[in-house]
């Protein structure tokens, strides 16, 4: 059976892990890091960069670098590069493709199956978009798992036999979740992890803390230099990077200095930024962001119907929880309970995803995971009211049916509008889509019986159907108002992703050919210069002409022309060796043995490009004097 990986697809960074011998291992990427920046860039030469290399060039390529795309999942957001538009799913697929490739390099085998995590508070459209991104990247998405649930799975399996309540406080780069889970083991060491309640804010994360520092720095420059940097894209990118660094430094230090030279230009010359930021200042400017974490926490405690004293463990997830102010607010909210420091907040979600992948694949048979739907699900009924069929925090998978009727006499069809959320009126909630049940037999209003069934699978993805009990006609939901991609669109994007991989391979091969050709030009020119006095003019002229032709080919884009001119130069260069050997023999005959041997031997290799060692024949040189 093929190996399945667990992927934490984050706003700022992503992580991939796998089970080895039943135990989870975080896989380092090609750059040697265990976390991969969720950054995608399109270079001006057309190359697609992903991860650390994309992040490093962001300042010089602002308009073609995409970050924090996770915040756009499940929306109609698109970005245009070189007259081609990309959806959030396509950009996320580039990140997933990079993680897939790194996992394949580590494991030495193809990887097709994956469990991908999402914030617990992701709605149906956001979950479906994540699944689509996995498909575009060439992955078979076994399961979509909530991030706090994955973290609790990684943490909870190491716990003892008693039932315990674990609170997971997950503050990532762009999203925030709080989940309460019950973890227990029986005598056979079989673990059951059940989510009791979950809540969150999909528009709150470390990016918002960074932005507050950026806004402060922009105002400082405006006050001191009279220049507004808010429209200067390159300056803003430098400020964003400096803000992220400052935020991290303030997690361990009480103050930091932000210094950026030549940030922009003013009437008085270049602008140099040099600002000191204390932890107290930082906490003051982000106080309202911290306040926003409290409501979801209180909602979870209320929904679960427990007291604070019932919480056994508090687990912090996401890099943003390293901020001291976040740790302090968690302690305050939980009545002074010290958060657990035994897990890596950046990696624990991917570890849990790998464990769940192992459970699905049958590698781990000692755990059962029971998740919940984070938001209530319902349809719009007369008066615009939201009639809920499935309440939030219902264990999934689940299926519920409800019978509705017509609002008018002889109504031939009903339009069923599906919503997700907690508000009393449908228009205030998230519209998932609409579908129509037609062919209803003529009857007075209130008489037809329309059975609407909601089915939420283990991924938290919604399926809806409606059936007229009178005629037996049935209609399943095809989302028309949501952001789910149609199958043909996904297929097209998959093909484009495969073509992109082939293009990368071709581009890499071309780069290798060019490097070899440039090396040949350099070594040949060096040889011509060093042996100018010993080479006949006709040989030197022929080789110089071949060098010039290869240089011209290298200036163009035709790689076949480069290969042809490279072969021509390699052939012409062999004449240098022949000429130098002839010169050496003449000098030996004139009584000066060995004087030109080094030059001749150097020339012998001049026409052989790097990597062509297969054509070299090893031979033993026999000293004629010894034989005598």
UniProtKB/Swiss-Prot annotation:
Protein origin, superkingdom: Bacteria
Keywords (alphabetical) are: ATP-binding, Chaperone, Nucleotide-binding, Phosphoprotein, Stress response
Give the matching SUPFAM superfamilies.
Answer: Actin-like ATPase domain, Heat shock protein 70kD (HSP70), C-terminal subdomain, Heat shock protein 70kD (HSP70), peptide-binding domain
Annotated GO MF terms: ATP binding; ATP-dependent protein folding chaperone; unfolded protein binding
Pfam families under this entry?
Answer: HSP70 (PF00012)
Query: Which spans does this entry mark as compositional bias, Low complexity?
Result: 584-610
Q: Where is this region: Disordered?
A: 583-628
Upregulation details from the record are: By stress conditions e.g. heat shock.
Cross-referenced InterPro entries: ATPase_NBD, Chaperone_DnaK, Heat_shock_70_CS, HSP70_C_sf, HSP70_peptide-bd_sf, Hsp_70_fam
Q: Which residues carry this modification: Phosphothreonine?
A: 175
What are the Acidic residues biased-composition ranges? 611-628
UniProt lists the family membership as follows: Belongs to the heat shock protein 70 family.
Protein purpose: Acts as a chaperone.
Identification of the protein by name: Chaperone protein DnaK
Species name: Beutenbergia cavernae (strain ATCC BAA-8 / DSM 12333 / CCUG 43141 / JCM 11478 / NBRC 16432 / NCIMB 13614 / HKI 0122)
Lineage of producing organism = Bacteria, Bacillati, Actinomycetota, Actinomycetes, Micrococcales
- Encoding gene (name): dnaK
